[in-house]
UniProtKB/Swiss-Prot annotation:
Pathway(s) annotated for this protein in UniProt: Cofactor biosynthesis; thiamine diphosphate biosynthesis; 4-methyl-5-(2-phosphoethyl)-thiazole from 5-(2-hydroxyethyl)-4-methylthiazole: step 1/1
Protein name: Hydroxyethylthiazole kinase
Positions annotated to bind ATP: R122, S168
Record-stated family: Belongs to the Thz kinase family.
Disulphide bridges, residue numbers: none
Catalysed reaction equations from the record: 5-(2-hydroxyethyl)-4-methylthiazole + ATP = 4-methyl-5-(2-phosphooxyethyl)-thiazole + ADP + H(+)
Organism: Solidesulfovibrio magneticus (strain ATCC 700980 / DSM 13731 / RS-1)
One Gene Ontology biological process: thiamine biosynthetic process
């Protein structure tokens, strides 16, 4: 099946089935992430309480854990929900926001990797390098490395964790430790809208909920981000307009638009 057709088939399943995607995310992006998942066709649930998160995770199609604001309850919720998801066979996606920047974030990322069996990890190059134990430069949550620089670390991390790893950037790199795919598309203006990386992680969760091939599902989610970002940026005055238009584009995205807006290479 052509790549765009495979992406759209998964997107159609999301739109038809509205999988429950449980998010334990940061307090900067909660509303934006929920709206993006709704535009995609998924059903978002946003939670921070450990007991609540664990119960929801057991019912979910996927669990998304984002450590952007690593407060105590958030982290305990991620660990509790991760355990419940693992017990129920629910895929878990981890977004290690600014993983190597502070000792607190290094500690939280380490606990997640040690405690929860992950289906996928999505981060920028600095975050993936930090998770892999390599030196990385970052400015807060922003990477100071190109995504391709982190490709070898992503492969090693995918092998050690037994999961799919996505390094997002101007070119997205997705690997399961054996296969490596690059996805180009999107628009530079996307870096001026806070939370679109978190949206990408949430989209990975939605695609994992409908496709048991987690490598393919991650590629498909990033293709939707690339195609929608490119279309949303066309003709807008700036990032404020892009943020609004992105939801509209995702809501009505077609197979032809995916084919035109996301370029894949192995």
């Amino acid at each position: 099946m052509p790549f765009a057709a495979a992406v759209f088939a998964d997107l159609a399943r999301i739109r038809q089935n509205a999988p429950l995607v449980v998010n334990i995310t940061n307090n900067v992006v909660t509303n934006a992430t929920a709206n993006a998942l709704l535009a995609l066709g998924a059903s978002p649930a946003m939670t921070h309480h450990p007991a609540d998160a664990a119960e929801l995770a057991a019912l979910a199609g996927a669990l998304v854990c984002n450590m952007g604001t690593p407060g105590g309850e958030n982290i305990e919720a991620m660990l509790a929900a991760g355990g419940a998801a693992n017990a129920g066979g629910v895929p878990v996606v981890f977004d290690p926001v600014a993983a190597g920047v502070t000792s607190r974030r290094r500690e939280v990322a380490g606990r997640m990797l040690e405690t929860v069996r992950l289906a996928a990890v999505r981060g920028n190059a600095s975050e993936i390098l930090a998770l892999a134990g390599e030196a990385a430069l970052s400015k807060g949550a922003d990477s100071q490395h190109a995504s391709r620089e982190a490709a070898p670390a992503a492969v090693a991390l995918a092998r050690s964790l037994g999961c799919t790893v996505c390094v997002s950037g101007e070119v997205d790199v997705v690997t399961d430790g054996e296969r490596v795919v690059e996805l180009a598309g999107g628009h530079a203006m996307m870096t001026r809208v806070t939370g679109l990386g978190c949206t990408a992680t949430a989209f990975v969760g939605a695609f994992l909920a409908v496709n048991p091939d987690y490598f393919a599902a991650t590629c498909h989610a990033m293709a939707v981000m690339a195609a929608a970002g490119r279309l949303a940026a066309a003709g807008v005055a700036g990032p404020g307009s892009l943020a609004v238009r992105f939801l509209d584009v995702v809501y009505s995205l077609t197979e032809a638009e995916i084919a035109a807006g996301a370029r894949v290479s192995a």
